[in-house]
Amino acid sequence: MAGIVGITEIKNRLPQDFVDNLYELFTPGVVDNIFRGIAEKRLTTLRVNTLKYDIQSLMKYFKEINIKFERVLWYNDALIIKNANEKDIQKLDIYQKGYIYLQSLSSMVPPLVLNPKEGENILDLTAAPGSKTTHIAALMNGKGYVLANELDKLRCERLKYNVQSQGTDIVEVVNGRGEKIGEQYPEKFDKVLLDTPCSGEGRFTIYNVQSYKTWSTKTVNDLTKMQKKLFKSAFNSLKPNGTLVYSTCTLNKQENEEILQWALDNFNVKLAPINIDIREGLPAFNAGMNKDINKAIRILPSKNMEGFFVSKFIKGEWKNIEIKNLK
């Protein structure tokens, strides 16, 4: 697609500070690949809701109605649709019954890294619209407890709808401030997902000016302050030895590696490796930082995937401590 829309034209459409940041962080060849990804029209992707259906039945059904698809090598319950868009899929009976969930492949990664098990208590701290919440519940085979928190009231209603349509009865939806959850539920959860609000650089597309129009360096700086508050809350809500997955759909270092370094400096946590082999994934950068930061992965935007960043923390054994370095 970048052969039709040239690299120079793509760069000229995007915020200059964003472009400059990319060249500071990546090699020119990788930056060009990111621009090509931003210029791609992404294929429709989905996962089967294993609480109601199974991948073999779904593939059989798609073959019967002549929907062409491709398997996802790193996740058996996901498909890439080759000849139908989201509106086409939404018309299908299996969509309306909640048998499938339209979801980007990148956003399937954090729940898989979290690896929730039957009977566990799980927190999704910033949960709307519910793709990851419902995925977590399905991975648990509908056995256990998931608290899904969302601050925005309208988004919270969308979250409730998706939870209900997917048949995820183990999910409790609450409309609260994420930074307060740690105080309300101290050391309550076995695992916590913090898929934090971010600047969304991994979702930029030249076909939607709104995807990048409001981006600014100030927005990134403001978001990092909120991300730190949310991380503190996530940490405090997590049991000792528990797993905390921190993820964003953005590309910059400030909201990703620098948050990881700050967390390692201020909390009793360590980073764990991510054992998912994704072709579009790169190790996070750790130059001048804790060497373990390269255990996190950055997914570059492409035809199949949005840009994403995923990391996995393990909490140490001692009790929660008050962290004041939130600047």
Map each language-model feature to its residues:
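S-adenosylmethionine
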Residues: 1-327
